[in-house]
Design a protein with these regions (language model features):
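Short, acidic, small-residue-rich periplasmic hinge/interaction motif at the N-terminus
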Residues: 27-30, 38, 42, 76-80, ...
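Gram-negative outer-membrane beta-barrel transporters
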Residues: 460-466, 559-563, 583-670, 707
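Outer-membrane beta-barrel signature, preferentially recognizing the C-terminal barrel domain
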Residues: 328-358, 401, 448, 503, ...
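Extracytoplasmic beta-strand/coil segments of soluble accessory domains associated
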Residues: 142-183, 202
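Surface-exposed extracellular loop regions of Gram-negative outer-membrane beta-barrel proteins
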Residues: 312-314, 318-329, 432-433, 443-444, ...
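Short acidic/polar hinge/loop motifs at secondary-structure boundaries
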Residues: 182-210, 227
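Transmembrane beta-barrel wall of Gram-negative outer-membrane proteins
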Residues: 246-273, 278-316, 340-367, 416-422
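Conserved C-terminal beta-signal and adjacent last beta-strands/turns
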Residues: 255, 294-296, 634-735
Length: 735
């Protein structure tokens, strides 16, 4: 009996020795801990079965019951380069420091809903990390997006003006915008990017192409996703600052963030005001938010996020067309001036609760509940009426929108092998809202209960990578439909010193967009509702290559082709009473090419530049359509030629950037009979930078449109001339 006790004890000691515990600590280039990093551990002798953990609020990933090694560790953190290292033996915390990298090597999450290197994502993704956003200091999302490849931003006027995004020839409501995991677009894709604050944003990703397989309705040509910064310091860190500039610009902000044990938090607020450059151009925006996370145990964590945003914009309307506000037509002189009685207000509230559960060594589940409420009002008192060849404008109106989106999401990620990963998901959403204009007795209330299920398989088979997925959608308005997507990548040349890798890419996808509430449910004197509208669709494919050069440069070139059909347009059904309704009648084509050069000249200096060519045409228009919306016409506000450049330096004592955006001439219209049919091209140059006075004090400055060019992104709405802001940031605590 004694022999068996000794033998059993020996076996237990042997098992304990062979089942080691490995701790991995992940830090960023400034040595700050990184929470939520995906750490994949492999036994070198059995590399086909990975074990996956996420780092805690303290930046630690702990692997228990692991063999004695050797092991290989791979760390994937969005916004940084993937990091792979080999551990010769189990050790106490092994610190892995991340680094910045060219865009193609940066880890992204939007393309596949899981962390993946951009070069293997099967889609084109541009990113802005926290350091870049801090230098750019954007007032709103449109200020940052206009310097990213393939993005054409059209803002109607100055700060707070209605701002739209056009990607690959698609409409402005063909983009899905997600904040902290919650869609912030109205049903049908409408969003104002000019009022979407990026205060306390840790990362922005801009994904181009049809992405409805993973993201559902509205992701017809792109997805924009932003995340709030998490707290990461054991000692609470208070950040606050303010800046001011010309045109009455004033900006103040503060945040309190930190992490202790299993708990992390960030509570923040921001206030921005400006008087603009002319009459009735004031704008103010206030933002409050919180991001709180708690690790219940090593296998389960929960995160609560909330944001409230309130903005007021004075809207002078279209009055200066390409520098001209006096027109002589038919012997009549028309003098246009700003509308002094119009303003827009927006109030929105976002909340989400995400539960992450890890089961087994390679299954991760996310259960999320969310709610988003949006209230907008566009009011014109009519105190500035003006005549046009088509009649008076600036007549009184009151457009009111109240939208609520609430629902539940599930996402499961299974890493079955080093070369295979599966993602599955289910979504339920309740869309409830009303659209009204009491002035014209126009309005309606709508309710949709939508469901969707999706699956995606990612495979790496030698030099070939395959990402294939599908989504089944049930929508109350347009019924059931399927949405497939497949992306192929082939490593044609692994390369040497000069040509350090050649990759060929191809993808085919479909996109869908549900009708807007005002298209489906609204009724009035001149409009009938249409409860039988179909989804707008996009058949999209793209093909291109990625070429690495000298280990510092990456050349990316793609051809894209989008065929939009079942597009919704308003059609008059009774010419006598002018009664009409929205119907699925339009079809259009957009195709072109994108060329991008990504480079990391040094570890601290990066430079990205891009050129986009876009050709569009209306293939089928509703009966009675006339220019500029007739069959054969190009789509409005889509330039044939556009280009961007962004040079960024990030050093220990100072940082700076230089951003340029060129947008060529594009078709447009005044819609009032003045004969305006285009908007001239323009070049916009912005600069920004900061200097560290001490470890706790920074001074910074930003200048936009430094060349002081007169330009309009939307005809009739002059943009700001040269404008600047300067201020100081302070930090207390945070060790």
């Amino acid at each position: 009996m004694r022999f068996f006790r000794i033998f059993g004890s020996a076996m237990c000691l042997l098992a304990a020795a062979s089942a080691a515990e490995i701790k991995i600590k992940v830090v960023d280039p400034q040595s700050a801990v990184v929470a939520g990093a995906q750490v994949v551990l492999l036994e070198v002798e059995n590399s086909s079965h990975p074990v996956v953990e996420l780092t805690s609020a303290e930046g630690l990933a702990i692997f228990r019951g692991i063999g004695s090694g050797p092991h290989q560790v791979r760390v994937l953190v969005p916004g940084f380069a993937a990091k792979t290292t080999t551990l010769s033996a189990a050790a106490d915390p092994v610190t892995i420091q991340l680094r910045l990298a060219p865009a193609s090597e940066t880890v992204v999450v939007t393309a596949t809903r899981t962390p993946v290197e951009a070069s293997s994502a099967g889609a084109d993704v541009a990113t802005l990390n926290q350091q870049q956003l801090q230098i750019m200091n954007p007032v709103a999302a449109d200020d940052a997006l206009r310097f990213l490849p393939g993005a054409v931003v059209n803002t109607a006027g100055q700060r707070g003006g209605l701002s739209s995004l056009f990607v690959r020839g698609g409409n402005s409501n063909y983009n899905k915008v997600i904040v902290d995991g919650v869609s912030v677009t109205e049903p049908g894709g409408t969003i104002d990017l000019g009022t979407l604050s990026l205060a306390e944003t840790s990362r922005l990703e801009f994904l181009r192409g049809a992405q409805s397989t993973l993201y559902g309705s509205d992701a017809m040509t792109s997805v924009v996703q932003v995340w709030t910064r998490n707290g990461s310091t054991p000692v609470p860190e208070l950040r606050f600052g303010a800046d001011a500039g010309n045109y009455g610009m004033e900006n103040g902000y503060a945040s309190l963030a930190g992490a202790h044990g299993r708990f992390d938090y960030n509570v923040f607020g921001n206030q921005f005001n400006t008087s603009g450059s002319g009459p009735n151009e004031d704008y103010s925006n206030s933002l409050e938010g919180a991001d709180v996370g708690f690790s219940i145990n090593d296998q389960m964590s929960v995160r609560l996020r909330a944001r409230h945003d309130n903005s007021v914009t004075e809207t002078p309307g279209a009055w200066n067309f390409n520098g001209q506000n006096i027109f002589h037509i038919g012997g009549v002189t028309y003098v246009l001036s700003p509308d002094l009685g119009a303003r827009a207000r927006q109030n929105n509230m976002l909340a989400s609760l995400d539960l992450a559960v890890k089961t087994g060594s390679n299954w991760t589940h996310h259960f999320a509940g969310f709610e988003y409420n949006l209230k907008t009002s566009n009011i014109d008192s009519g105190i500035s009426p003006e005549n046009t060849p088509f009649g008076p404008i600036n007549t009184p109106f009151e457009a009111l929108v109240n939208i609520n989106r609430a629902g539940f999401d599930y996402q499961g990620d299974y890493v079955e092998r080093t070369w295979a990963e599966t993602t599955i998901g289910y979504e339920f959403e309740d869309e409830n809202g009303s659209v009204n204009d009491p002035t014209f007795a126009l309005g309606g209330h709508g309710l949709r209960l939508n469901e969707a299920a999706y699956a995606q398989q990612a495979l790496t088979l030698g030099r070939l990578s395959v990402i294939a997925g599908g989504r089944f959608v049930h929508n109350t308005t347009f019924g059931n439909t399927g949405v497939p997507r497949v992306a192929l990548g082939f490593q044609a040349l692994r390369g040497g010193h000069i040509l350090s890798g050649t990759r060929l890419n191809f993808s085919y996808a479909t996109g869908i967009k549900e009708p807007r509430f005002e298209e489906t449910f609204v009724t009035g004197q001149f409009q009938l509702p249409n409860l039988n509208l179909k989804a707008e669709r996009n058949r999209a494919f793209e093909a291109g290559f990625q070429q690495n050069l000298l280990g510092r440069f990456v050349l990316v070139a793609n051809y894209y082709n989008n065929l939009f059909h079942d597009q919704i347009e308003f059609v008059t059904v009774n010419p006598t009473t002018f009664l009409g309704q929205y119907v699925n009648l339009q079809k259009s084509l957009a195709h072109g090419a994108e060329v991008e050069l990504q480079s990391r000249l040094t570890q601290r200096l990066s430079w990205n530049t891009s050129y986009t060519y876009t050709s569009t045409q209306i293939l089928l228009a509703p009966p009675g359509s006339f220019p500029p919306n007739a069959q054969g016409d190009p789509l409005l506000r889509r330039p044939r030629h556009s280009a961007t450049t962004l040079l960024t330096y990030l050093g220990p004592r100072w940082g700076g950037n230089l951003g340029g955006s060129f947008v060529g001439p594009r078709p447009d219209s005044d819609f009032d009979g003045f004969g305006i049919n285009h908007t001239p091209g323009y070049f916009l140059l912005d600069i920004g930078g900061w200097y560290k006075v001490s470890s706790r004090v920074q001074v910074y400055a930003n200048a936009e449109n430094v060349l002081n060019h007169f330009y309009e992104e939307v005809t009739g709405y002059p943009a700001l001339g040269a404008n600047f802001r300067a201020g100081m940031r302070f930090r207390i605590g945070g060790e």
